[in-house]
Amino acid sequence: MYVVLEGVDGAGKSTQVELLKTRFKNALFTKEPGGTRMGESLRHIALNENISELARAFLFLSDRAEHVESVIKPALKEKKLIISDRSLISGMAYSQFSSLELNLLATQSILPEKIILLVIDKEGLKQRLSLKSLDKIENQGIEKLLTIQQKIKTHAYALKEKFGCEVLELDAKESAKNLHEKIAAFIECVV
């Protein structure tokens, strides 16, 4: 089963992934972008080089294609539980070029069965971002991140409607423990 955690920077995805690692010890944990060695290189170029938005979008699509081919497909073949920190959903939300068709090509139409959305309000986001050093994307501001969050939700629910992906939307301001229990129950109801 292929499960993804989605949310903007500061929503608590990384915290939840770490908690899930203790609970699902046999699962394959991965991330997008950068879930492969090639992906890390592409991610570095996309985030650090002065390139066009279109070129950046294709770098992330290349990363996604390699990630699905070399990580996701083999794990699905072995019937492993795959838990990914982000997926094509974030890829489409963060990009100015959010073509579902190109993403379906890159993923070979392999989509997550379960999508966990961590949603945070403006005040919660401000508070969390004040506690960490900000990267290039986070430095674009709270309003930009809230716009991206809305796009993440839109893309997740579009996948639910078009392809039957299950979606669990959670308030990221809940305690990490409560969120973990809800996420684990959502994953376990099929595992």
From Swiss-Prot:
It catalyses: dTMP + ATP = dTDP + ADP. One of its GO terms (molecular function) is ATP binding. GO terms for cellular component: cytosol. Gene3D superfamilies: P-loop containing nucleotide triphosphate hydrolases. ATP binds at residues 7-14. Coiled coil: none annotated. It comes from the Bacteria. PROSITE patterns: THYMIDYLATE_KINASE (PS01331). It holds the Pfam family Thymidylate_kin. InterPro entries: P-loop_NTPase, Thymidylate_kin-like_dom, Thymidylate_kin_CS, Thymidylate_kinase. Its EC number is 2.7.4.9. Keywords: ATP-binding, Kinase, Nucleotide biosynthesis, Nucleotide-binding, Transferase. One of its GO terms (biological process) is dTDP biosynthetic process. NCBIfam families: DTMP_kinase. Phosphorylation of dTMP to form dTDP in both de novo and salvage pathways of dTTP synthesis. Belongs to the thymidylate kinase family. This is Thymidylate kinase. It comes from Helicobacter pylori (strain G27). The lineage of its organism: Bacteria, Pseudomonadati, Campylobacterota, Epsilonproteobacteria, Campylobacterales.
